Amino acid sequence: MLGVIADDFTGASDIASFLVENGLSTVQMNGVPTQSLNSKVDAIVISLKSRSNPVNEAIEQSLRAYQWLKENGCTQFYFKYCSTFDSTAKGNIGPVTDALLDELNEDFTVITPALPVNGRTIFNGYLFVGDVLLSESGMKNHPITPMVDANLMRLMDAQAKGKTGLVAYADVIKGASRVQECFAELKAQGYRYAVVDAVDNSQLEVLAEAVADFKLVTGGSGLGAYMAARLSGGKKGTNAFTPTKGKTVVLSGSCSVMTNKQVEKYREKAPHFQLDVEQAIHNENYIEQLYQWVIANLDSEFAPMVYATVPPDALKAIQHQFGVDQASHAIENTFAKLAAKLKQYGVTNFITAGGETSSIVVQELGFTGFHIGKQIAPGVPWLKAVEEDIFLALKSGNFGKEDFFEYAQGMFL
């Protein structure tokens, strides 16, 4: 059984959707469960909020997740992080990878965030978003993890205790045996991690074969999909659900390039309310005002949207005025409390944009786990809470096409 430790919520639902699509029955747990799993599945995904919190917390959470997965029958483990890496020199990917390797008594693993279907590719160890380097993409303006270097070896070496080598494209296309030879060569030279080039899915397929016997694999959801395909014998997932029509709200906290486009497009069709950060910080009645506005607009043709999404210049101004931490906390807290009030009112469908926003909303709603439904876009499935008929679409910042919010609602039964 495959056990996945994901460093944020949207990342967890991202990989869970690819596992289901490729034939593995999968359950997604919100945080480390306190009880044993009582259903039979092929894979378990645990979502943590460990991407940008203090490193000791990230390690502690990840090791607890690993322990629970092991106790519940998992024999191979996958540390899932974002396809844009989202980890600076002070980041947690290196330290968590090291802690998991030590716990498993292993001394080598791969670093493969590639997700070609969404334009995330690796060549010569450099991570690309579409046709530009990660460091020249919108990710350089990320409010919490600005990505100013695209070289994955340097990024990993800056935050991990070992050395990072490269398995280059020219070797990967020779097949799994050659990739395994490269691993052996790197290990002999004292390397602890290998960045593996992948410019399209065929390289991920090769890599899935090459790491079939690894106890720990790390990467984005792309490699996970091909590992699932191997484990399931090429089965395809069936019977994925879509939500029932009901009261719906859109909550957008991401400031990514794509989410800005999605918000702009959706504003043309739906009632929308831009969250005011100063009000969120200082006005204790602000959540009530937002709540009243949303419920007044719930009968619109398209769901009302509350958004904190702004372009890079406006984001910098907000961060300069209020501080990064205070602004982020105020926005997340506002969305979380608003979501809780709306659920109480009878909203059953939540569409959220942004990893931090999604994580905090799910925590506030208090669900322990999710069934994985139909994909809205690659890496973004509909989820259904295990406790009740509440449906969520949790979108990582740059995922989805420009009509994402409208398209998601078009899937209602």
Swiss-Prot record:
Gene3D superfamilies for this protein: Four-carbon acid sugar kinase, nucleotide binding domain, Putative sugar-binding, N-terminal domain
EC code(s) of this entry: 2.7.1.217
Transmembrane segments: none
Binding site for ATP: S254, G354, G355, E356, T357, G397
Keyword Transferase: yes
Reactions catalysed according to its record: 3-dehydro-L-erythronate + ATP = 3-dehydro-4-O-phospho-L-erythronate + ADP + H(+); 3-dehydro-D-erythronate + ATP = 3-dehydro-4-O-phospho-D-erythronate + ADP + H(+)
Keywords per UniProt: ATP-binding, Carbohydrate metabolism, Kinase, Nucleotide-binding, Transferase
Top-level taxon in the UniProt lineage: Bacteria
SUPFAM superfamilies: YgbK-like
One Pfam family per UniProt: SBD_N
Keyword Lipoprotein belongs to the record: no
One GO MF term: ATP binding
Membership in a protein family: Belongs to the four-carbon acid sugar kinase family.
Job description of the protein: Catalyzes the ATP-dependent phosphorylation of 3-oxo-tetronate to 3-oxo-tetronate 4-phosphate.
Entry protein name: 3-oxo-tetronate kinase
Gene (UniProt): otnK
